Amino acid sequence: MWLAPGGVRQQGEGGQTRLKFWSFLFACCSLNLFPSSPLPLSANGLATVYHALAAQNVSPAPAPALRVDPKAQVLFDQVIQTLGGQAFLGFKTLTTRGRSFSITDEQTTGFVTFESQVEYPDKRRFAYGLGKKKPIVLINNGDQAWEVDRMGLTHQTPEQARRWKITNAYSLENLLRLRTREPGTLIQDAGSDFIQNLATRVLDISLANRVDVKLYLNKANPLPVRITYRVQDPKTLEWDEYADIYGDYQSFQGIQTPMHITRFFNDERISETFRSTAKYDEVFPASLFQPPEQ
């Protein structure tokens, strides 16, 4: 026998259920969990609710499981092994050098040489320029984004930072090593198609964040040929179409690395990157992904 909120004595299983409900309700009210509160719940608040639920033997809903149909699983495993197996899954950094072209209306509008240093999943330093001039440096570190040029330090524009976060999230490396392993992801065999005059197999990847990705694989290898995905613009609410074409794979440190990458935005080719060198697992100082001291 025990006292429920309000001093009402309860007995038996039904009374225990009512006690759990009122205890949970009280915890929610104490933490302002209802829609009348304009502020999001803090991490401490979430932890408190979790412990309150645990104390009442009420388990939070489990995260949705990763789902892969059997045909897709076989194909996905082949992709990982072809790219390098554990060497591909385990590398932490990638340094590349080469040339990059910007394209507008199918005409080349710019050309630079570059050095790119990436620490996965979300840090990069990209230095580009021409000749002996001091290069422009783009630095991204999670949600932070800076640009360093001959005039000094500034922040990247919000749109510039947003675009990089999107394309980085669904890059070959992050898609296959992170996104496809997130809870709630569904991977299905989507049949065959022709891309870049190549016969391909297609995997349809539906992510928990409601982004749909298509991964096109060369039937002969099977190396990734193309990745396409749609992301909604938060301002216009229009759906933007992104596509990356991967080619000229070469092996570096046991990892098959695409040396030619072409990017499309809403069906328009906007850039081509030709890598000349690639090196994995260089150790970078933390300061590499921070703005220089002024």
In which residue ranges do the predicted regions lie?
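Gly/Pro-enriched, hydrophobic low-complexity segments
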Residues: 131, 192, 196-293
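Signal peptide processing junction and immediate N-terminal pro/mature segment
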Residues: 33-60
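Bacterial N-terminal signal peptides
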Residues: 23-36
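Short, conserved active-site entrance elements at the starts or edges of catalytic domains
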Residues: 166-202, 224-228
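Intrinsically disordered, glycine-rich low-complexity segments
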Residues: 4-16
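Acidic/charged, solvent-exposed loop-and-adjacent secondary-structure segments enriched in E/D, K/R, S/T
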Residues: 146-176
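N-terminal mature ectodomain segment of secretory-pathway/periplasmic proteins
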Residues: 60, 66-153, 183-191
